[in-house]
Amino acid sequence: MSFADVSYDEAMRRARECVPTLLERAQKCEDARVLLPENEKLLHEAGLFRFHQPRRFGGMELPFQAIVDIVAELARGCPSTAWNVGNLGCHHWILGYYEPETQHEVWDANPDVLIASSIALAAGRGRIAKDGFVVSGRWPFSSGVDNSDWNMLAVTVYGDDGKTPVDWRLCIVPKTDYRVIDTWYAMGMVGTGSKDIEVKEIFVPERRALALKLCRGGPGHPGGKLNPGPLFRIPIVASAGHPLSATALGAAEGAFQHVVKSFKTRLGTYTGAKIADFQAVQIKIAEARCLIDSAIALMRDSAVAFQEFAQKNQVPDLETKLRFRAHNALAVRHARQAVEALWSCYGANAIYTRDPLQRFMRDLQAMSQHFSFNFDIAGAGYGTAVMGGTYVNPTM
């Protein structure tokens, strides 16, 4: 099925329509520890994995900010499912940077195909071989891997001495080439199914090994001529946090809506007083709202800016890229702090597993541990660059 004629507004309508069902199934998703097959089916039917797939392959090819808005909307219902939509959906976008032959190989067979990933460059080792690379490694946190037929694995390629890095590749490999190791017993984001992946001495042809240094912005990557639209001129590594951090926005929003709805009618267990009349509660609600609004503004500002740079055929400088990565990290921090504020005034009901607030809280805590959302790391990078220091990342 083609979704090439689906507009941004229609995609958002479809996402909103999915939220009640995702919320209803959120506990089942957590219990299963994977993207539920019925949720996958629901999202396939709505086309919501294909918002950034090139139109020539039947995708929506929506502006970059759609990945923030769609994922955040879905996360109001189930953050784990939304995380997988952002993660698996953005791989349709990244595949658009690969050689045309590889794009056709994957999408001609199945335009709905799901592609997992693990972006830990240090986890994969590669060496140069004739017409490609020989790759080995074990990668953690491959979200949605059980639902996927392919996997994009980050690999550091070493020179003849086996010690000197000479290249950084994102290798797309079929599921027949890797082993899934079930390590995913987590306290939050449980339904993402983010298991380990292992490969041993597999050959990856050049056309399936995307050079990340060619994807730092602009059309000069292998897929640039096939997909000339602005979406495919956005720097991959600099913007890679957006598909995932959007989940934090929606999780915080879902928690906020749940708490406000509860407080409008809830009475204190011991006093019988209306909770909504307590000034301390009112202040916490306002604090949470402002933190969520701040997080949304940070994320949308940088997402829109990435799209605008690309539309003008411009590439943001390193300082700007690092500032936008810091936006990601601070947005997730603000989202987590918002839910912490809600949690602090919600009372003992928050500890029941039947109450969605505890799952939103655990999910935000788990998300905050992601490398990309560590503000000390992201902030140090931007602070170094803006004050004239040297920041080295050959893939940025």
Q: Can you say where each PLM-predicted feature lies in the sequence?
A:
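Short, structured patches in soluble enzyme cores that scaffold and shape functional sites
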Residues: 128, 139, 154-157, 172-175, ...
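Glycine-rich flavin
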Residues: 35-45, 50-149, 162-166
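A short core secondary-structure module
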Residues: 142-183, 193
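Glycine-rich phosphate/cofactor-binding loops in nucleotide/flavin-utilizing enzymes
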Residues: 346-396
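Charged, amphipathic alpha-helical oligomerization/scaffolding segments
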Residues: 17, 251, 258, 287, ...
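C-terminal helix-coil-helix/basic helical segment that borders enzyme active sites and/or dimer interfaces
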Residues: 23, 27-31, 293-330, 343-351
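Glycine-rich beta->alpha junctions and the first turn(s) of the following alpha-helix
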Residues: 196-292
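Basic/polar N-terminal segments that are highly enriched at the extreme N-terminus
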Residues: 1-13, 17, 395-396
